[in-house]
Amino acid sequence: DNYTGDFYITAQTNDKDLILRCDDGSGGVTAYLTLDGSVGYTTVQKRIRFNDNVFLGVGTGNDFTIDHDGSHTSLQNSTGNLSIKNYADDGDIIFQSDDGSGGIVTYFELDGSVTNIKVYKDIVFADNIDAHFGTGGDLRIYHDGTDSRFQEFTGNLNIINYADNKDIIFQSDDGSGGVETYFFLDGSTGHTQFPDAKKLQF
């Protein structure tokens, strides 16, 4: 106990450590915390548990904090950018969450070996939220709650099928609640085909 002023624990020997040890739960003794005097950093050898609503603050002004309130966990940054980086060669950044059945599944990952983003679950855009493609957002896809639109603001809008002998097929409602083909671009013959009994009105 200390009742006046600060309380110091000091190791004066050059390049030596200050080691906090305790029982290891099996009748022995082990290090829990080491202040390493030879390299100038602190090594934590055992888990640290923060109780609910006690945050871990990083930075002189606690600019980055991690906390858990008993129900939810928050990572909060209040100064500058918040960057997530993986410097491991060919390593990935993987985002996982509950799979709806009590398990864990990958939703998407940043693949460092092939430098692309892999998406394993649906992406849902709310009504009136555009998906933009191109540096200037020149191609946009959106749904307004009633209708869907593809919009191109620069250059041509091309629909291309590179598969040998395959088609581009245009389908729509058949007037009876089903879907049928109205016409298709036949990749095996090079013709535009209109199925039987389809009227072409001008």
Predicted regions, residues:
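Self-maturation zones of extracellular/virion spikes and adhesins
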Residues: 1-32, 37-202
